[in-house]
Protein backbone atom coordinates (compact mmCIF):
# COMPACT_ATOMS: atom_id res chain seq x y z
CA UNK A 1 0.00 0.00 0.00
CA UNK A 2 1.40 3.34 -1.10
CA UNK A 3 -0.85 5.43 1.14
CA UNK A 4 0.47 7.45 4.07
CA UNK A 5 -1.16 7.99 7.43
CA UNK A 6 -3.33 11.11 7.31
CA UNK A 7 -2.45 11.95 10.92
CA UNK A 8 1.28 11.44 11.39
CA UNK A 9 2.62 10.76 7.88
CA UNK A 10 3.82 7.22 8.58
CA UNK A 11 3.08 4.53 5.94
CA UNK A 12 -0.56 3.55 6.38
CA UNK A 13 -1.53 0.06 7.46
CA UNK A 14 -5.05 0.24 6.06
CA UNK A 15 -8.33 2.09 5.99
CA UNK A 16 -9.34 2.51 9.64
CA UNK A 17 -12.20 4.55 11.13
CA UNK A 18 -12.90 6.20 7.79
CA UNK A 19 -9.34 7.25 6.87
CA UNK A 20 -6.00 5.76 5.85
CA UNK A 21 -4.02 5.56 9.09
CA UNK A 22 -1.18 3.63 10.65
CA UNK A 23 -1.63 1.09 13.43
CA UNK A 24 -0.57 3.58 16.12
CA UNK A 25 -3.08 6.28 15.17
CA UNK A 26 -5.79 3.67 14.68
CA UNK A 27 -5.36 2.27 18.20
CA UNK A 28 -5.05 5.78 19.68
CA UNK A 29 -8.34 6.90 18.12
CA UNK A 30 -10.10 3.72 19.24
CA UNK A 31 -8.96 4.24 22.84
CA UNK A 32 -9.70 7.96 23.18
CA UNK A 33 -12.82 8.43 21.02
CA UNK A 34 -15.30 7.74 23.82
CA UNK A 35 -13.11 9.14 26.62
CA UNK A 36 -12.41 12.69 25.51
CA UNK A 37 -12.98 14.18 28.97
CA UNK A 38 -9.96 12.27 30.32
CA UNK A 39 -7.57 14.02 27.90
CA UNK A 40 -5.78 17.07 29.29
CA UNK A 41 -5.93 20.27 27.29
CA UNK A 42 -3.11 21.45 25.09
CA UNK A 43 -0.66 23.74 26.90
CA UNK A 44 0.43 25.41 23.66
CA UNK A 45 -3.01 26.67 22.56
CA UNK A 46 -3.47 23.84 20.03
CA UNK A 47 -0.43 24.69 17.87
CA UNK A 48 1.39 21.36 18.23
CA UNK A 49 2.76 19.74 15.06
CA UNK A 50 1.78 16.07 14.80
CA UNK A 51 4.26 13.90 12.89
CA UNK A 52 5.94 10.54 13.25
CA UNK A 53 8.39 11.68 15.92
CA UNK A 54 6.29 13.77 18.30
CA UNK A 55 2.82 12.33 17.76
CA UNK A 56 2.71 11.12 21.38
CA UNK A 57 3.63 14.51 22.87
CA UNK A 58 0.13 16.06 22.88
CA UNK A 59 -2.94 13.83 22.92
CA UNK A 60 -5.37 16.70 22.45
CA UNK A 61 -3.78 17.91 19.20
CA UNK A 62 -3.42 14.34 17.92
CA UNK A 63 -7.11 13.61 18.51
CA UNK A 64 -8.07 16.93 16.93
CA UNK A 65 -6.12 16.03 13.79
CA UNK A 66 -7.71 12.57 13.70
CA UNK A 67 -11.13 14.21 13.65
CA UNK A 68 -10.08 16.75 11.04
CA UNK A 69 -8.91 14.10 8.57
CA UNK A 70 -12.33 12.41 8.74
CA UNK A 71 -11.97 9.65 11.32
CA UNK A 72 -15.28 8.89 13.04
CA UNK A 73 -17.09 6.13 14.84
CA UNK A 74 -19.33 5.44 11.87
CA UNK A 75 -16.27 4.42 9.87
CA UNK A 76 -15.29 1.74 12.40
CA UNK A 77 -15.83 -1.88 11.50
CA UNK A 78 -18.54 -3.94 13.17
CA UNK A 79 -17.15 -7.44 13.16
CA UNK A 80 -14.86 -8.29 10.23
CA UNK A 81 -16.08 -6.20 7.32
CA UNK A 82 -14.22 -5.39 4.15
CA UNK A 83 -12.67 -2.05 3.30
CA UNK A 84 -15.11 -1.72 0.40
CA UNK A 85 -18.06 -1.72 2.80
CA UNK A 86 -16.43 0.89 5.04
CA UNK A 87 -15.58 3.14 2.08
CA UNK A 88 -19.15 2.76 0.81
CA UNK A 89 -20.55 3.80 4.22
CA UNK A 90 -18.21 6.79 4.31
CA UNK A 91 -19.29 7.93 0.84
CA UNK A 92 -22.95 7.69 1.82
CA UNK A 93 -22.30 9.74 4.93
CA UNK A 94 -20.52 12.42 2.93
CA UNK A 95 -23.39 12.57 0.41
CA UNK A 96 -25.93 12.91 3.23
CA UNK A 97 -23.92 15.75 4.77
CA UNK A 98 -23.63 17.58 1.44
CA UNK A 99 -27.38 17.11 0.78
CA UNK A 100 -28.30 18.64 4.14
CA UNK A 101 -26.09 21.62 3.34
CA UNK A 102 -28.35 22.55 0.39
CA UNK A 103 -25.66 22.29 -2.25
CA UNK A 104 -23.44 24.85 -0.51
CA UNK A 105 -19.71 24.33 -0.66
CA UNK A 106 -18.34 22.71 2.45
CA UNK A 107 -14.83 24.13 3.22
CA UNK A 108 -11.74 23.89 1.13
CA UNK A 109 -8.96 21.34 1.46
CA UNK A 110 -9.54 18.47 3.83
CA UNK A 111 -12.60 20.13 5.34
CA UNK A 112 -14.80 18.61 2.63
CA UNK A 113 -14.53 15.18 4.21
CA UNK A 114 -15.49 16.29 7.73
CA UNK A 115 -18.88 14.96 8.85
CA UNK A 116 -21.33 16.37 11.37
CA UNK A 117 -20.24 13.78 13.93
CA UNK A 118 -16.66 14.94 13.52
CA UNK A 119 -17.71 18.55 14.00
CA UNK A 120 -19.57 17.57 17.16
CA UNK A 121 -16.53 15.73 18.44
CA UNK A 122 -14.40 18.79 17.67
CA UNK A 123 -16.73 20.97 19.70
CA UNK A 124 -16.59 18.55 22.62
CA UNK A 125 -12.82 18.38 22.38
CA UNK A 126 -12.55 22.17 22.34
CA UNK A 127 -14.76 22.44 25.42
CA UNK A 128 -12.75 19.79 27.26
CA UNK A 129 -9.54 21.55 26.26
CA UNK A 130 -10.80 24.85 27.67
CA UNK A 131 -11.81 23.21 30.93
CA UNK A 132 -8.47 21.43 31.25
CA UNK A 133 -6.53 24.64 30.53
CA UNK A 134 -8.53 26.55 33.13
CA UNK A 135 -7.95 23.78 35.66
CA UNK A 136 -4.22 23.73 34.88
CA UNK A 137 -3.84 27.48 35.31
CA UNK A 138 -5.85 27.76 38.53
CA UNK A 139 -4.27 26.19 41.62
CA UNK A 140 -6.56 27.39 44.39
CA UNK A 141 -10.01 26.04 43.54
CA UNK A 142 -10.11 24.47 40.07
CA UNK A 143 -13.63 23.07 40.34
CA UNK A 144 -15.37 26.39 40.97
CA UNK A 145 -13.19 28.33 38.50
CA UNK A 146 -13.70 25.87 35.66
CA UNK A 147 -17.44 25.74 36.28
CA UNK A 148 -17.59 29.53 36.30
CA UNK A 149 -15.57 29.76 33.09
CA UNK A 150 -17.79 27.28 31.24
CA UNK A 151 -21.14 28.59 32.42
CA UNK A 152 -20.51 32.33 32.31
CA UNK A 153 -20.98 32.56 28.47
CA UNK A 154 -24.40 30.92 28.86
CA UNK A 155 -25.41 33.48 31.46
CA UNK A 156 -24.24 36.32 29.22
CA UNK A 157 -26.26 34.93 26.30
CA UNK A 158 -29.34 34.54 28.47
CA UNK A 159 -28.94 38.06 29.80
CA UNK A 160 -28.60 39.48 26.29
CA UNK A 161 -31.64 37.48 25.14
CA UNK A 162 -33.80 38.77 27.97
CA UNK A 163 -32.76 42.42 27.46
CA UNK A 164 -35.30 44.88 26.08
CA UNK A 165 -34.87 45.46 22.36
CA UNK A 166 -31.94 43.03 22.16
CA UNK A 167 -29.60 45.37 24.05
CA UNK A 168 -28.45 44.75 27.62
CA UNK A 169 -26.69 47.23 29.84
CA UNK A 170 -23.22 46.37 31.22
CA UNK A 171 -24.52 46.75 34.76
CA UNK A 172 -27.08 44.01 34.15
CA UNK A 173 -24.39 41.64 32.83
CA UNK A 174 -22.15 42.39 35.78
CA UNK A 175 -25.01 41.80 38.19
CA UNK A 176 -25.80 38.48 36.49
CA UNK A 177 -22.17 37.39 36.79
CA UNK A 178 -22.05 38.32 40.48
CA UNK A 179 -25.29 36.47 41.13
CA UNK A 180 -23.99 33.35 39.42
CA UNK A 181 -20.72 33.45 41.37
CA UNK A 182 -22.65 33.82 44.61
CA UNK A 183 -24.81 30.80 43.76
CA UNK A 184 -21.70 28.75 43.00
CA UNK A 185 -20.16 29.69 46.34
CA UNK A 186 -23.33 28.76 48.19
CA UNK A 187 -23.56 25.40 46.41
CA UNK A 188 -19.92 24.58 47.16
CA UNK A 189 -20.37 25.58 50.79
CA UNK A 190 -23.47 23.44 51.18
CA UNK A 191 -21.76 20.47 49.57
CA UNK A 192 -18.63 20.75 51.73
CA UNK A 193 -20.19 21.50 55.14
CA UNK A 194 -22.63 19.27 57.06
CA UNK A 195 -26.26 20.25 57.23
CA UNK A 196 -26.46 21.95 60.61
CA UNK A 197 -28.87 24.53 62.00
CA UNK A 198 -27.48 27.93 61.16
CA UNK A 199 -24.37 26.59 59.42
CA UNK A 200 -25.33 27.92 56.00
CA UNK A 201 -26.85 31.18 57.20
CA UNK A 202 -23.57 32.97 57.80
CA UNK A 203 -22.16 34.71 54.75
CA UNK A 204 -19.51 37.14 53.62
CA UNK A 205 -20.09 40.89 53.63
CA UNK A 206 -19.40 41.09 49.92
CA UNK A 207 -22.22 38.61 49.33
CA UNK A 208 -24.51 40.95 51.27
CA UNK A 209 -23.55 43.73 48.90
CA UNK A 210 -24.27 41.48 45.94
CA UNK A 211 -27.67 40.72 47.41
CA UNK A 212 -28.45 44.42 47.77
CA UNK A 213 -27.25 45.15 44.22
CA UNK A 214 -29.24 42.29 42.71
CA UNK A 215 -32.35 43.04 44.75
CA UNK A 216 -34.05 45.12 42.07
CA UNK A 217 -32.58 43.55 38.93
CA UNK A 218 -32.70 39.74 39.13
CA UNK A 219 -35.92 37.93 40.00
CA UNK A 220 -35.23 34.59 41.68
CA UNK A 221 -37.75 31.73 41.44
CA UNK A 222 -38.70 32.16 45.09
CA UNK A 223 -39.41 35.88 44.61
CA UNK A 224 -41.50 35.23 41.50
CA UNK A 225 -43.63 32.65 43.27
CA UNK A 226 -44.16 34.53 46.55
CA UNK A 227 -45.89 37.83 45.75
CA UNK A 228 -47.38 38.63 49.14
CA UNK A 229 -44.53 40.39 50.99
CA UNK A 230 -41.02 41.50 49.99
CA UNK A 231 -38.12 39.48 51.32
CA UNK A 232 -36.41 41.15 54.29
CA UNK A 233 -32.66 40.98 54.80
CA UNK A 234 -32.23 39.79 58.38
CA UNK A 235 -28.52 40.54 58.32
CA UNK A 236 -29.05 44.23 57.67
CA UNK A 237 -27.74 46.44 60.53
CA UNK A 238 -31.00 48.44 60.67
CA UNK A 239 -33.08 45.32 61.19
CA UNK A 240 -33.91 44.80 64.90
CA UNK A 241 -32.21 41.93 66.67
CA UNK A 242 -33.97 38.91 68.09
CA UNK A 243 -36.09 39.79 71.11
CA UNK A 244 -35.40 38.33 74.55
CA UNK A 245 -38.61 36.24 74.83
CA UNK A 246 -37.75 34.57 71.54
CA UNK A 247 -34.27 33.80 72.81
CA UNK A 248 -35.71 32.34 76.02
CA UNK A 249 -38.11 30.18 74.03
CA UNK A 250 -35.29 28.93 71.84
CA UNK A 251 -33.14 28.13 74.88
CA UNK A 252 -36.02 26.30 76.57
CA UNK A 253 -36.73 24.34 73.41
CA UNK A 254 -33.06 23.42 73.18
CA UNK A 255 -33.07 22.12 76.77
CA UNK A 256 -36.20 20.05 76.08
CA UNK A 257 -34.59 18.50 73.04
CA UNK A 258 -31.47 17.67 75.04
CA UNK A 259 -33.54 15.98 77.76
CA UNK A 260 -35.46 13.95 75.18
CA UNK A 261 -32.21 12.89 73.54
CA UNK A 262 -30.66 11.85 76.86
CA UNK A 263 -33.74 9.90 77.91
CA UNK A 264 -33.74 7.99 74.62
CA UNK A 265 -29.99 7.45 74.57
CA UNK A 266 -29.77 5.87 78.08
CA UNK A 267 -30.40 2.06 78.20
CA UNK A 268 -33.45 0.86 80.09
CA UNK A 269 -31.74 -2.15 81.69
CA UNK A 270 -28.25 -3.53 81.46
CA UNK A 271 -27.49 -7.17 82.24
CA UNK A 272 -23.91 -6.29 83.09
CA UNK A 273 -24.87 -3.88 85.89
CA UNK A 274 -27.30 -5.75 88.24
CA UNK A 275 -26.83 -3.23 91.09
CA UNK A 276 -27.18 -0.04 89.01
CA UNK A 277 -30.66 0.60 90.41
CA UNK A 278 -29.45 0.55 94.04
CA UNK A 279 -28.54 3.80 95.82
CA UNK A 280 -24.83 4.48 96.48
CA UNK A 281 -25.35 4.02 100.26
CA UNK A 282 -26.26 0.37 99.82
CA UNK A 283 -23.43 -0.15 97.39
CA UNK A 284 -20.94 1.18 99.95
CA UNK A 285 -22.49 -0.91 102.78
CA UNK A 286 -21.19 -4.21 101.51
CA UNK A 287 -22.97 -5.19 98.33
CA UNK A 288 -20.52 -7.30 96.31
CA UNK A 289 -18.95 -5.65 93.33
CA UNK A 290 -19.52 -6.76 89.79
CA UNK A 291 -16.55 -9.19 89.37
CA UNK A 292 -17.26 -10.83 92.76
CA UNK A 293 -20.93 -11.18 91.91
CA UNK A 294 -20.07 -12.80 88.58
CA UNK A 295 -17.74 -15.37 90.22
CA UNK A 296 -20.30 -16.19 92.90
CA UNK A 297 -23.06 -16.56 90.33
CA UNK A 298 -20.93 -18.94 88.25
CA UNK A 299 -20.06 -21.02 91.32
CA UNK A 300 -23.71 -21.34 92.28
CA UNK A 301 -24.61 -22.47 88.78
CA UNK A 302 -21.84 -25.07 88.64
CA UNK A 303 -22.17 -26.34 92.24
CA UNK A 304 -25.74 -25.87 93.51
CA UNK A 305 -26.21 -25.98 97.29
CA UNK A 306 -29.19 -27.57 99.06
CA UNK A 307 -30.45 -27.36 102.64
CA UNK A 308 -31.07 -31.13 103.03
CA UNK A 309 -28.79 -32.67 105.73
CA UNK A 310 -28.85 -36.05 104.03
CA UNK A 311 -27.11 -34.64 100.98
CA UNK A 312 -24.58 -32.73 103.07
CA UNK A 313 -23.51 -35.92 104.95
CA UNK A 314 -20.62 -37.71 103.22
CA UNK A 315 -20.91 -41.31 102.18
CA UNK A 316 -19.65 -43.76 104.84
CA UNK A 317 -17.78 -46.75 103.43
CA UNK A 318 -16.92 -48.37 106.79
CA UNK A 319 -18.38 -51.61 108.23
CA UNK A 320 -20.76 -51.18 111.12
CA UNK A 321 -22.75 -53.62 113.23
CA UNK A 322 -26.43 -54.26 112.83
CA UNK A 323 -27.15 -52.97 116.35
CA UNK A 324 -25.81 -49.50 115.51
CA UNK A 325 -27.60 -48.22 112.41
CA UNK A 326 -26.62 -44.63 113.06
CA UNK A 327 -23.80 -43.02 111.16
CA UNK A 328 -20.57 -42.25 113.00
CA UNK A 329 -20.90 -38.65 111.84
CA UNK A 330 -24.17 -38.34 113.77
CA UNK A 331 -22.31 -38.51 117.09
CA UNK A 332 -20.50 -35.65 118.66
CA UNK A 333 -17.55 -34.28 116.80
CA UNK A 334 -15.37 -34.97 119.86
CA UNK A 335 -15.89 -38.77 119.59
CA UNK A 336 -12.69 -40.82 119.88
CA UNK A 337 -10.85 -42.17 116.87
CA UNK A 338 -8.87 -45.33 116.41
CA UNK A 339 -5.56 -43.54 116.25
CA UNK A 340 -5.86 -42.25 119.86
CA UNK A 341 -6.50 -45.22 122.25
CA UNK A 342 -5.66 -43.34 125.47
CA UNK A 343 -8.13 -40.58 124.81
CA UNK A 344 -10.75 -43.18 123.92
CA UNK A 345 -10.38 -45.05 127.24
CA UNK A 346 -10.57 -41.79 129.18
CA UNK A 347 -13.78 -40.83 127.45
CA UNK A 348 -15.28 -44.27 128.10
CA UNK A 349 -14.53 -44.01 131.79
CA UNK A 350 -16.21 -40.70 132.22
CA UNK A 351 -19.29 -41.42 130.14
CA UNK A 352 -22.02 -43.71 131.38
CA UNK A 353 -23.21 -44.50 127.88
CA UNK A 354 -21.36 -47.15 125.93
CA UNK A 355 -20.09 -46.01 122.59
CA UNK A 356 -19.43 -48.72 120.08
CA UNK A 357 -16.40 -48.19 117.92
CA UNK A 358 -16.82 -48.49 114.20
CA UNK A 359 -14.64 -50.79 112.22
CA UNK A 360 -13.09 -49.16 109.19
CA UNK A 361 -13.21 -50.74 105.78
CA UNK A 362 -10.28 -53.04 105.19
CA UNK A 363 -9.11 -52.89 101.62
CA UNK A 364 -6.06 -55.14 102.05
CA UNK A 365 -5.80 -58.40 100.16
CA UNK A 366 -6.45 -61.07 102.83
CA UNK A 367 -7.40 -64.61 101.95
CA UNK A 368 -10.75 -65.37 103.50
CA UNK A 369 -12.04 -68.81 104.38
CA UNK A 370 -14.16 -70.11 101.62
CA UNK A 371 -16.81 -72.71 102.04
CA UNK A 372 -16.01 -75.71 99.94
CA UNK A 373 -18.48 -78.40 99.30
From Swiss-Prot:
Protein name, UniProt field = Protein embryonic gonad
Swiss-Prot/TrEMBL GO biological process terms: cell differentiation; central nervous system development; regulation of DNA-templated transcription; regulation of transcription by RNA polymerase II
Q: In what tissue types does this protein appear? A: During embryonic stages 10 and 11, expression was observed in four neuroblasts, NB2-4, NB3-3, NB6-4 and NB7-3. Except for NB6-4, expression reaches a maximum at the very beginning of expression or in the period of neuroblast delamination. Weak expression is also observed in a few putative progeny of NB7-3 during late embryonic stage 11 and 12. All eagle expression in abdominal segments disappears by stage 13.
Q: Which SMART domains match?
A: ZnF_C4 (SM00399)
Fetch the Pfam families from UniProt.
Answer: zf-C4
Q: What happens when the gene is disrupted?
A: EG cells fail to acquire the neural fate or underwent an extremely delayed differentiation, while EW neurons produced neurites in abnormal directions.
Similarity section: Belongs to the nuclear hormone receptor family. NR0 subfamily.
Record-linked PROSITE patterns: NUCLEAR_REC_DBD_1 (PS00031), NUCLEAR_REC_DBD_2 (PS51030)
Amino acid sequence: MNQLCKVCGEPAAGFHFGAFTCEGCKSFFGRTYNNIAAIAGCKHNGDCVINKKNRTACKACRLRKCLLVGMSKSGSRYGRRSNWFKIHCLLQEQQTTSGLGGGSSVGSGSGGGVSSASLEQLARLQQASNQARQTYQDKTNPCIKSATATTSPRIEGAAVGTGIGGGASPSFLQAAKLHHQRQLKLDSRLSNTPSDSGASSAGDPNEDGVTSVLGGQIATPSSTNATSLPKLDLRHPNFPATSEPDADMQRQRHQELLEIFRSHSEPLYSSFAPFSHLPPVLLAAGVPQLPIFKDQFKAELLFPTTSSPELEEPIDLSFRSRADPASPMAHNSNSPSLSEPAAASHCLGESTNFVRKSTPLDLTLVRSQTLTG
